[in-house]
Amino acid sequence: VALAIMALMATLGWRVLASMQTAVEINRQHADQVLTLDASLAQWGMDLDAMVELPLTRTLEWDGRALHLTRRSGSTGSDGAIVVAWTRASRNGQFQWLRWQSLPFTSREGWQTAWNEAHNWAQTSQDSTDRREVRLTGLAEWQVFFYRTGAWGNPLSSTGADPAVNNSLPDGIRLVL
């Protein structure tokens, strides 16, 4: 009887250890996901903070699928500027939040090329092998709102808005994931 009780206790002990190991692994995966999302949001903030208005170019555009922006290339901007695009697209059969950035440029022609590349990349729904694409995290859906003239609104909405206001940079950008 004692041997049977000890065998039962040993079996239960191993089950407890296996359950604890599973819990540790689940917590580790969750922590990794949270850290990835935190780093992604930090990059989002850095991109918005580094936006730069260049003559005869667009600084920010939301087309309903991707957010495109022009930003300084480095912390000082002496290396020129880059175009960054953020979008949600299917990669490997799962929707992902993605970021893409152009090579640095210093001319309007370079900006136009980078802007067109960003638009082409964002419209591509199949898996991309572009080295400038970074897959950030799984994302079911996302929404972007601009804060202009004292209210949050859809960036694509132009109802009752002054065209000069719609073409200016918003006072704030809200991201809903």
Please tell me what each predicted stretch does.
Residues 64-154:
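Type IV pilin-like appendage domain
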Residues 1-45, 49:
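Aliphatic-rich helix starts adjacent to a transmembrane/signal segment
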Residues 61-63, 78, 167-171:
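Solvent-exposed loop and beta-edge segments used for protein-protein assembly and interaction
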Residues 48-71:
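Short, glycine/small-hydrophobic-rich surface segments
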Residues 152-177:
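Short, surface-exposed polybasic-and-hydrophobic patches located at secondary-structure transitions
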